[in-house]
Amino acid sequence: MAGFSYLFKNRAVFPFASYAHIKAWAKRFQTLPELIRRNRRRYRLVKKSACIDERAEIGQVKAGGNKKNLKIGAYTFIGQVEFSLHDQIVIGENVCVNDGVLFLTASHDLKDPEWKHVKSPIIIEDYAWICTNSIILPGVRIGRGAVVGAGAVVSKNVGDYEIVAGNPAQVLTKKRTEKLEYNPCSFLAANRAWLIG
């Protein structure tokens, strides 16, 4: 939701010079520097061939490798994360990726005497939540609405609505609700200033 055109078009409107009008514009000006930074981050990645929806929120991302391997859907929040783009990383819509997450799309073949480079894509489905300091290894698919607990190391696929934690990541007994309608970007102050006032 960081796109200026989207926020301006969908902004909350209040009677001119009313308390709500003045308060909303004060918040908008106060949060403008962060909004500009997030738009620049997204623009820089898109300029290098990444496919990022205008309504996605991009934090301080470190992206090594071919940027065209990165695809991020609408209303997805990406914190301070690191992408290893040797192969595709596809992140769906309404996904929340917290700070410190590392996405690795390549490793080495331990059975090969020449220790060859092996790469494989990572797929994150809609409404997934990847918590702080998790590591997502090559070839992993994280299902719709799945949760990866803080510090988890994910080397195997995570099913829809499953909750995993630990090193290596293990499925917990409880499942997440399947009725998901939230937008992780709507909680950011800059977006709230425009959309709510």
What is the role of each PLM region?
Residues M1-L104, L110, D126-Y127, R144, ...:
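Domain-scale signature associated with acetyltransferase and cell-envelope carbohydrate enzymes
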Residues K67, K119, L137:
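Short, surface-exposed alpha-helical recognition segments that flank or form part
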Residues W115-I124:
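Glycine-rich NAD(P)-binding loop of Rossmann-like domains
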Residues T132-K156:
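Beta-rich strand-turn-strand
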